[in-house]
A protein has these predicted regions:
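Hydrophobic alpha-helical segments at protein termini of multi-pass membrane proteins
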Residues: 1-239
Length: 239
């Protein structure tokens, strides 16, 4: 009887984890398949996913620290509280952690020799982050959460990764061309732009009672990200 119960529990948890992981893997494959010039090695991709998982742990600590500081400065019932929480604490903790691990694991890689590589690298880090976060959510809240996050949060992290990767690839290109000032600007944008999008995503999802505003936002976000992937892939070149 105990064995049957344990076996059922393990099978259920396996299904939950599969439901959490499969959407992220699917999106990784789609972005990877768009790498026309020189697809990255499995070793590089696995390093990026692990970096994304580690960035999730960094962000968790950062969010706890800075959200505690925020509550000391701004009352939780103040209208400004949620703005600062989502746009500053959560968004910059998560996107900043992703960027930190992205740069640490790929900036000096000899395989970083095409502009579209920046998109692949950033998306794999973002989805490593999302994969770990999703497993945690799904194990706590079940299949319904897996279904909702598979069409919202997982693609959302992918989109943030696309925007980060576009600027990251541009930064590498102009750095190789000797323009370090413009490279710095693109590196800053690689954090700021996805952080602002992330903050808007969380803020609209949490505070807006009209679901259609959120649906419209993610439709535009997904559409813009898809267009960027297609454009960057089509115009890819060695750098």
């Amino acid at each position: 009887m105990f064995y049957f119960f344990l076996s059922s529990l393990l099978n259920y948890n396996f299904l939950l984890i599969a439901a959490a992981v499969i959407p992220a893997i699917f999106l990784m494959v789609k972005v990877y398949q768009s790498d026309r010039l020189e697809p990255e090695s499995t070793a590089v991709l696995w390093t990026l996913v692990r970096s994304g998982i580690f960035s999730c742990l960094i962000a968790l600590v950062s969010e706890k620290v800075f959200s505690s500081v925020l509550t000391l400065i701004v009352p939780q019932n103040h209208p400004l509280y949620l703005v600062l929480l989502f746009f500053v604490v959560v968004a910059f903790s998560e996107e900043g952690a992703k960027y930190f691990m992205l740069r640490r694991s790929s900036w000096n890689s000899p395989e970083f020799n095409c502009q579209y590589d920046g998109v692949v690298y950033a998306v794999f880090v973002s989805l490593g982050f999302a994969l770990w976060e999703n497993i945690s959510y799904v194990l706590h809240y079940g299949f319904s959460t897996a279904l909702v996050r598979s069409v919202t949060a997982i693609p959302g992290h992918t989109c943030f990764g696309v925007f980060m990767g576009v600027f990251y690839g541009l930064a590498r290109r102009v750095e190789n061309a000797g323009d370090s000032e413009k490279a710095l600007l693109f590196r800053v944008l690689a954090v700021v732009v996805p952080a602002l999008l992330h903050g808007a995503y969380d803020y609209i999802a949490t505070t807006n009672t009209n679901t259609w505003y959120f649906v419209l936002f993610i439709a535009v976000l997904f559409g813009a990200s898809y267009w960027l992937v297609v454009k960057t892939s089509r115009e890819d070149r060695y750098i």
